[in-house]
């Protein structure tokens, strides 16, 4: 049986940046080189002691909201935008015993007006007015072609309550698990990530968007895994 200290020594990390940018374009990329437009870049960090690695296989996708207008911001009510989904895959060179996902940073966290850990910021307008927030729903988790469960936990070495879907949280870890509560091992991990944006009311934006505004959020995710 592998001891906890051995598990910690064998822990490696993989990071990807997810950026919500510009006039409501969402770009997600696993390109290891910065894009010329500076939209999004993914970086891979592998600890020097390990020769085994994982990479993210994901095509860059952009989602334009061509009909966006100031009229979408209501006087007193929030307004939900249509959800957008894509599948994230993590492919490893060897079988890993546990794969987890955590939020490293939300660069627009200060624009979130509540304490909900599933809310991530879309940026400011009119000084300190809030443009809104978005959530990231995780579901359809798989190891290879086999469906598995998801969980959230505060301890990366423990498995939480198994769920078929959950919302990404700003603290703790999300992971893949088998029925029965053990971490799911494998070489190819995938999960659907659905982004659900909610625009603030004009009360929260501190008035009309006279000068216009761009949604401008950024999440950086880390994927610790154990060999």
Locate the predicted segments by residue.
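Mature extracellular/passenger domains of Gram-negative fimbrial/pilin and adhesin proteins
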Residues: 2-5, 30-227
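Bacterial N-terminal signal peptides that target proteins for export
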Residues: 3-17
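Bacterial N-terminal signal peptides
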Residues: 15-25
């Amino acid at each position: 049986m592998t001891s906890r200290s051995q598990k910690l020594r064998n822990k490696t990390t993989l990071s990807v940046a997810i950026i919500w940018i510009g006039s409501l374009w969402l770009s997600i990329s696993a390109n290891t080189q910065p894009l010329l437009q500076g939209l999004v870049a993914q970086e891979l960090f592998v600890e020097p002691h390990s020769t085994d690695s994982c990479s993210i296989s994901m095509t860059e996708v952009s989602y334009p909201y061509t009909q966006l207008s100031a009229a979408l911001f209501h006087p007193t009510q929030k307004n939900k935008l249509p959800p957008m989904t894509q599948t994230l895959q993590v492919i490893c060179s060897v079988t890993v015993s546990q794969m987890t996902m955590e939020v490293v940073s939300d660069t627009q966290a200060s624009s979130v007006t509540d304490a909900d850990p599933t809310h991530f910021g879309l940026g400011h307008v009119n000084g300190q007015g809030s443009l809104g927030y978005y959530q990231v729903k995780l579901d359809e988790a798989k190891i290879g072609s086999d469906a598995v469960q998801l969980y959230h936990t505060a301890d990366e070495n423990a498995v939480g309550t198994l769920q078929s879907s959950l919302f990404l949280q700003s603290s703790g870890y999300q992971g893949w698990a088998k029925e029965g509560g053990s971490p799911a091992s494998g070489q190819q991990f995938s999960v659907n990530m659905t982004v659900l944006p909610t625009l603030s009311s004009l009360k929260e934006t501190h008035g009309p968007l006279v000068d216009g505004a761009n949604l401008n959020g950024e999440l950086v995710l880390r994927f610790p895994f154990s060999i």
